[in-house]
UniProtKB/Swiss-Prot annotation:
A GO molecular-function descriptor: calcium ion binding
Described function: Acts as a calcium sensor for mitochondrial flash (mitoflash) activation, an event characterized by stochastic bursts of superoxide production. May play a role in neuronal differentiation.
Effect of E150K: In mtEFHD1; abolished ability to enhance mitoflash activity
Organism, scientific name: Homo sapiens (Human)
Compositional bias (Basic and acidic residues): 1-18
UniProt keyword annotation of Mitochondrion present: yes
Keyword Membrane: yes
Subcellular location, record wording: Mitochondrion inner membrane
Binding locations of Ca(2+) 1: D103, D107, E114
Primary location class: mitochondrion
Protein name: EF-hand domain-containing protein D1
Length: 239
């Protein structure tokens, strides 16, 4: 009797377990929902031709810097007075005024169209390719426009003889009338005339200064000889 009762209990238990396994399994209350599977990332796009050209230009510039053919860009704040010590403060101010005059967009840059208008007003109009070539020659950050530093670099290269005589940048530098009255040069029409006259004035001043120093040395030598002669004469009287 006991064995039959035990067998019935086992049979009911097996049926209950089978029913639980075959039915839908509900998530317990309060259990966190399963996280959604992340979607696969789209494949990376192949580099475009413009990206290849930009990378090539950057590598080319790095080679120029390593070989000393180009100035490395500085991360610090640009200071024209320390970076271009050959220019006086007045000259830099005049060049800055000229830069702002043609910076019609007031964004701190002279773009292609603004450079086109500048060259037309200076009486040396350039073709579209000529304008792009002008910018490219001093465009150190490859942004296709001129910053104030790159604008000053034009005059630095011109003064150092690094520009072609028939280039657009040379025409810009020659035709830019800069007030250099406080450079110690009166009546100079442009930067190059000012540099020549400034060098002449400096040479003349150095010559006058050297002549004064030589005259002072000669007078001191004559005074020393007179004192020596007086001491000798005095010694003769005492003997």
């Amino acid at each position: 009797m006991a064995s039959e009762e035990l067998a019935c209990k086992l049979e009911r238990r097996l049926r209950r377990e089978e029913a639980e396994e075959s039915g839908p399994q509900l998530a317990p209350l309060g259990a966190p929902a399963p996280e959604p599977k992340p979607e696969p990332e789209p494949p990376a796009r192949a580099p475009t031709a413009s990206a290849d050209a930009e990378l090539s230009a950057q590598l080319s510039r790095r080679l120029d810097i390593n070989e000393g053919a180009a100035r490395p860009r500085r991360c610090r704040v640009f200071n024209p007075y320390t970076e271009f010590p050959e220019f006086s403060r007045r000259l830099i101010k005049d060049l800055e005024s000229m830069f702002k005059l043609y910076d019609a967009g007031r964004d701190g840059f002279i773009d292609l169209m603004e450079l086109k208008l500048m060259m037309e007003k200076l009486g040396a109009p350039q073709t579209h390719l000529g304008l792009k070539s002008m910018i490219k020659e001093v465009d150190e950050d490859f942004d296709g426009k001129l910053s104030f530093r790159e604008f000053l670099l034009i005059f630095h290269k011109a003064a150092a003889g690094e520009l072609q005589e028939d280039s657009g940048l040379m025409a810009l530098a020659k035709l830019s009338e800069i007030d250099v009255a406080l450079e110690g040069v009166k009546g100079a029409k442009n930067f190059f005339e000012a540099k020549v006259q400034a060098l002449s004035s400096a040479s003349k001043f150095e010559a006058e200064l050297k002549a004064e120093q030589d005259e002072r040395k000669r007078e001191e030598e004559e005074r020393r000889l007179r004192q020596a002669a007086f001491q000798k004469l005095k010694a003769n009287f005492n003997t």
